[in-house]
Amino acid sequence: MRPSGTARTTLLVLLTALCAAGGALEEKKVCQGTSNRLTQLGTFEDHFLSLQRMYNNCEVVLGNLEITYVQRNYDLSFLKTIQEVAGYVLIALNTVERIPLENLQIIRGNALYENTYALAILSNYGTNRTGLRELPMRNLQEILIGAVRFSNNPILCNMDTIQWRDIVQNVFMSNMSMDLQSHPSSCPKCDPSCPNGSCWGGGEENCQKLTKIICAQQCSHRCRGRSPSDCCHNQCAAGCTGPRESDCLVCQKFQDEATCKDTCPPLMLYNPTTYQMDVNPEGKYSFGATCVKKCPRNYVVTDHGSCVRACGPDYYEVEEDGIRKCKKCDGPCRKVCNGIGIGEFKDTLSINATNIKHFKYCTAISGDLHILPVAFKGDSFTRTPPLDPRELEILKTVKEITGFLLIQAWPDNWTDLHAFENLEIIRGRTKQHGQFSLAVVGLNITSLGLRSLKEISDGDVIISGNRNLCYANTINWKKLFGTPNQKTKIMNNRAEKDCKAVNHVCNPLCSSEGCWGPEPRDCVSCQNVSRGRECVEKCNILEGEPREFVENSECIQCHPECLPQAMNITCTGRGPDNCIQCAHYIDGPHCVKTCPAGIMGENNTLVWKYADANNVCHLCHANCTYGCAGPGLQGCEVWPSGPKIPSIATGIVGGLLFIVVVALGIGLFMRRRHIVRKRTLRRLLQERELVEPLTPSGEAPNQAHLRILKETEFKKIKVLGSGAFGTVYKGLWIPEGEKVKIPVAIKELREATSPKANKEILDEAYVMASVDNPHVCRLLGICLTSTVQLITQLMPYGCLLDYVREHKDNIGSQYLLNWCVQIAKGMNYLEDRRLVHRDLAARNVLVKTPQHVKITDFGLAKLLGAEEKEYHAEGGKVPIKWMALESILHRIYTHQSDVWSYGVTVWELMTFGSKPYDGIPASDISSILEKGERLPQPPICTIDVYMIMVKCWMIDADSRPKFRELILEFSKMARDPQRYLVIQGDERMHLPSPTDSNFYRALMDEEDMEDVVDADEYLIPQQGFFNSPSTSRTPLLSSLSATSNNSTVACINRNGSCRVKEDAFLQRYSSDPTGAVTEDNIDDAFLPVPEYVNQSVPKRPAGSVQNPVYHNQPLHPAPGRDLHYQNPHSNAVGNPEYLNTAQPTCLSSGFNSPALWIQKGSHQMSLDNPDYQQDFFPKETKPNGIFKGPTAENAEYLRVAPPSSEFIGA
């Protein structure tokens, strides 16, 4: 009988686990890993060889596993041995077809790529559909820290089937970035035996092994099956073969031979016999996630028992008993620095203001030190400023000088050379004039202050011309010299009798060997005893604090655990075992602060002790596993079952009572406030006087409509992106009571978002609800759930920046100039509405169709008041490289600062998505702008286009063009695009169909996106009439847009009647006046029904267009046809399809009143933009009340854009 697929999978898991457990006893081969990220090491061949040398036969990677720049024909079979990675795994920029990480079990994530990702698979593709296709990580079952990122892997198979929730910890799931492309035709399908269709590749062996999401509720982490008895030990990672800590496939923390442990066996154990910490013969060092008896070669041991490659700060490396260890430095760690005349100071005369910082933390000077008068005067020739005397304190760390010390200048108000108070030795290997190793000449000091100087190995000493210097003659210099022929020249200093007259003599506590100054710490040696570096008369043996004992004429402090005795000695020597009486407790011969509690002892047992009435520590009973308070078993019960449980119960009851009291107090407070408000409201309603406005602004009221949606009215389909504010979803809006689906983008704040973030998203909703323009993204609605959600129109082509980067080889001059016109129109509309955008960039322009773009992202936009001309920002993150200079320096934002950002946006388009000021830090932008530097002229731009950009970047904001002027300039250029933009092969370029866009495919590849209605179409009234003039927000037209282009105008809307939505705007969107239409577009594709004027459309055969509302118009001309751009001087009459030659065939009887059809020359429209009031409504009427058609010569009135819907009909 053949075993089932599930049985075979289980058997395979068991065999793998047994092999891993058996192999755990063997020492695994480790390798360091790399941290090169995306850096290429030499040629492709050199890079690959470096990779092969690093990971050949490697099983554990201590650092990061980075597989980059591997070409198609290279063999990566040496990666099969890798089982564990301590850092992150980066697989990027490869064209090799298969990367066999078949035995990789765990990624620990001790270091993360971009501080977020433990596994990053990025841009693994080449030309001609080559690249990474297979990544069989069939044994990867655990990522301890970090998330996963996939991006730009167009032919990588099966990754979309993996259940990452089983591998990644739940806390990191929100950081996942999964840009996966599915290729069912070319990729192998998962084996039918794979659980839930999850696999790493074709075949049963590549099925994903689930060890977390299938576990029973009783399991804390991993399991080997669905039963509660299949739970793994909590020390296990990536699964197990049994319930014990020795049955783990991989250890979560440390592996000690075949057992998983929380920590490695300690190096020291408590000995209850000697009352000391003894060396543990079973102790081990931690090396990565493994416990080892000794650290590998070239590693050093820390105090905590870890193997590291280098000691930390304040530690130095030393060898003891054949083991390299890290020892804590006594003071600053040794640091050798070059002296004057060596290395970087080769041509330097003296320590000065520019080089003094190089001596910071130096303990040894290799060479000489000179301090000359030029240091304090400065040097105008070399532009060296005077030295600040306080900076000489840097030299206090210097203990050794291998050459000589020359001091010919010193601060006048300093009385000694205390900057060198820690100098211990002057070796004199080089000498001034070949003679002197210490020279102090012409200073105003009273003492030398070299209190730590113990040796001058070679060279003479000269101390001369210091008119106030005393004490120098008291020093026994011969005792400091290293050779008998060394001499001193101490002359022309202050006379000895003058020094005695002013009491500049050695302290009485100094011995006859002399002193360096007047203080007791300046003595060369002490007359009596010393405490540290200072001479004292006597030690604190019987009185005083702290208590001391005498050793070699030095006062040594007693151990802190010794109890001070009244008029008696406190201790007899060093350590806690020489105390006369203990301050706290006594454990054997030692004084201790507390009795041992839970200290690791022999045989991995914890040692517990209690103190008796005499504060002597005694061992607890062997069965007392949590400590004791007395002898025997009865002492064990005091802590666990005595006061502990009642105290816990008391704490719980007390906490509950406190919560109840607080709740009652809050309730009473809210009740009281409600009553006060109610009374205040009643009193106000009874007032007869009305409050008169004191400062009317005269500004028109904002009558924008804000739609409040229920959460049941829309459905989230997939995540489009996430950030600090929250998450953006693709979804469908299904209005209540209507059978339509509208694709939308849903912007949702994170849980527990701050009140500031809530305010910011509501401010953004206010701005978006206040706008209504074809080239500005508008708000469809807002949902006020616990996390505020904004619902906007979905743009399936993504942002304009990504769009031009993806299609840069197919974008012609016409499209670029049209986009410039449309963005300028949108910004001009915002300026008319007194809105400052503050974040205009190509990334914040969305593509509705290739001919229609919209401005979005109003997160930084501000609405100016009636009297405001500019906005002053307070702080926050801002796009420096797109901002005007006044915005960077003074945080001033105006409509003219938006013009600057517009210029940068145009530059992004003309360079097909290049980064502005690439390689220049944002902190340097303001300085280079002030110096006159600007973005370079794009290669495709003529000087006409570039001069417009330059005008946008003028320092004087008033000198920049207005958006109205920019519309005129770019509209003129769009009528003759190849004159202003020079693109090779421009006449043959055309944008691909929507489905060729990667973003479009990823966005629309959902079965829920069928039979949808575009938001613009839903909001624009369908063919028919309003119920009454009172409900209409626009004047009634004789004809509206038809629902089909192959029928006469019909009065049919979605609900089968002639009524339209009351909240819809008539003539909401207009086609771009500069959009390009070819004869082929007109003859062979669907021509959209005019929305603004009554234009006729010739009937077409019934089968030519299945659903004209969703049909996409071709974007490229037919071969052999000349492309006709809109030109106001062309003869548009020659094409009768653009003229109003037909009358509506359906008129409701409710509109027979002539008054409803009488139009005046000045139309009062409720549209937001006065430009559209002027340009898109006829100003003349026929006697019969029907509007006249637009002037054929004016391209602004022609409907030449493709359909507004970007969705293809089913």
Curated annotation (Swiss-Prot):
InterPro entries named in the record: Egfr_JX_dom (IPR044912), Furin-like_Cys-rich_dom (IPR006211), Furin_repeat (IPR006212), GF_recep_IV (IPR032778), Growth_fac_rcpt_cys_sf (IPR009030), Kinase-like_dom_sf (IPR011009), Prot_kinase_dom (IPR000719), Protein_kinase_ATP_BS (IPR017441)
Chain intervals for the UniProt region annotation (Disordered)? 1113-1137
Class in the EC hierarchy, top level: transferase
Task: Write out the topological domains of type Cytoplasmic.
Answer: 671-1210
Q: Which residues carry this modification: Phosphothreonine?
A: 680, 695, 1043
Q: How is its activity regulated?
A: Endocytosis and inhibition of the activated EGFR by phosphatases like PTPRJ and PTPRK constitute immediate regulatory mechanisms. Upon EGF-binding phosphorylates EPS15 that regulates EGFR endocytosis and activity. Moreover, inducible feedback inhibitors including LRIG1, SOCS4, SOCS5 and ERRFI1 constitute alternative regulatory mechanisms for the EGFR signaling.
**Where does cross-link Glycyl lysine isopeptide (Lys-Gly) (interchain with G-Cter in ubiquitin) occur?**
718, 739, 756, 759, 869, 931, 962, 972
Q: Which residues carry this modification: Phosphotyrosine?
A: 871, 1000, 1018, 1069, 1092, 1110, 1172, 1197
Looking at the UniProt entry, the stretches that span the membrane are: 648-670
User: Does this UniProt record's set of keywords contain Lipoprotein?
Assistant: yes
The site feature described as Important for interaction with PIK3C2B is recorded at 1018
Which SUPFAM superfamilies does the UniProt record give? Growth factor receptor domain, L domain-like, Protein kinase-like (PK-like)
Q: Where mainly located? A: membrane
Knockout mutant characteristics: Mice are growth retarded and die at different stages of development depending on their genetic background. Embryonic death is due to placental defects. Mice surviving until birth or later display brain, bone, heart and various epithelial development defects in several organs, including skin, lung and gastrointestinal tract.
Family, according to the entry, reads as follows:
Belongs to the protein kinase superfamily. Tyr protein kinase family. EGF receptor subfamily.
Q: Which PANTHER family match?
A: EPIDERMAL GROWTH FACTOR RECEPTOR, TYROSINE-PROTEIN KINASE RECEPTOR
Task: Spell out the subunit comment.
Answer: Binding of the ligand triggers homo- and/or heterodimerization of the receptor triggering its autophosphorylation. Heterodimer with ERBB2. Forms a complex with CCDC88A/GIV (via SH2-like region) and GNAI3 which leads to enhanced EGFR signaling and triggering of cell migration; binding of CCDC88A requires autophosphorylation of the EGFR C-terminal region, and ligand stimulation is required for recruitment of GNAI3 to the complex. Interacts with ERRFI1; inhibits dimerization of the kinase domain and autophosphorylation. Part of a complex with ERBB2 and either PIK3C2A or PIK3C2B.
Q: What is this protein called?
A: Epidermal growth factor receptor
Source organism per entry reads Mus musculus
Query: Taxonomic lineage of this organism?
Result: Eukaryota, Metazoa, Chordata, Craniata, Vertebrata
Its gene name is Egfr
